[in-house]
């Protein structure tokens, strides 16, 4: 009787050890989204591994280098506007580099504000302010039940005169900062869509906990995301058997 009891205990520990040794590798998955007719590709890969107390850890990495290469077009699609009697804004060029756990975005923009007035029966269009500016924005990602979020902090604004004041203290600077953050956040959400990246059973039980930008191959921008997968050891073993 004692022998059988010891055998059962040994089998339980052996099964637990086998579960703890298993790692479910997530093969690279390519997703893409359109920016002005150009397909921007994001490649994501990762693994699910066992942790303490039968918890399973999720680790994902996404290569954002194609997003870096098409950043100017992405921001232009969200920020550019040309109102005849109002604001005209164009993104001339932009860069995004890793500064783990954040990333630093530098945008070169041209801005003008125009007003239309009627004089002597005709409309006169007059430029009120205009010039070039360089904005440096720190982007810090986070992750939670709702997915990836992005916080933006303006670190530096280079602009002369009244344009500098508009960007530093007016609503223009806030609007630009918020649109930059939402553009990058939306792009990463599309590239790290759990339903398309993970097996269905894992995606349905996954919760993201943390995210950070990291420097990948050749200094390219990657994002690393950690989380948990709430499945039983039996489900985890079943997923490995199906590979």
Residue ranges: model-predicted function:
Residues 6-13:
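Bacterial N-terminal signal peptides
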Residues 1-4:
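Positively charged n-region of N-terminal signal peptides that target proteins for export
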Residues 18-243:
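Extracellular/lumenal and peripheral-membrane lipid-interaction modules
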């Amino acid at each position: 009787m004692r022998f059988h009891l010891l055998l059962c205990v040994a089998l339980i520990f052996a099964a637990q050890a086998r579960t703890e040794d298993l790692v479910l590798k997530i093969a690279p998955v390519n997703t893409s989204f359109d920016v002005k007719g150009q397909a921007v590709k994001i490649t994501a890969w990762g693994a699910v591994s066992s942790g303490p107390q039968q918890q399973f850890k999720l680790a994902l990495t996404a290569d954002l280098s194609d997003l870096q290469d098409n950043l100017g077009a992405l921001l232009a699609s969200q920020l550019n506007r040309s109102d005849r009697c109002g604001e005209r804004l164009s993104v001339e060029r932009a860069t995004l580099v890793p500064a783990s756990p954040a990333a630093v975005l530098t945008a070169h923009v041209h801005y003008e504000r125009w007003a239309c007035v009627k004089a002597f029966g005709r409309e006169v269009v007059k430029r009120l302010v205009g010039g070039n500016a360089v904005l440096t924005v720190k982007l810090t990602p986070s992750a939670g039940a709702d997915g990836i979020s992005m916080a933006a902090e303006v670190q530096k604004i280079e602009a002369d005169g009244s344009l500098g004041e508009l960007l530093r203290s007016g609503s223009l600077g806030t609007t630009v900062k918020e649109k930059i953050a939402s553009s990058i956040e939306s792009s990463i959400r599309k590239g790290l869509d759990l339903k398309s990246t993970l097996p269905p059973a894992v995606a349905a039980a996954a919760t993201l906990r943390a995210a950070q930008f990291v420097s990948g191959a050749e200094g390219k921008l990657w994002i690393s995301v950690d989380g948990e997968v709430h499945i039983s050891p039996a489900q985890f073993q079943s997923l490995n058997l199906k590979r």
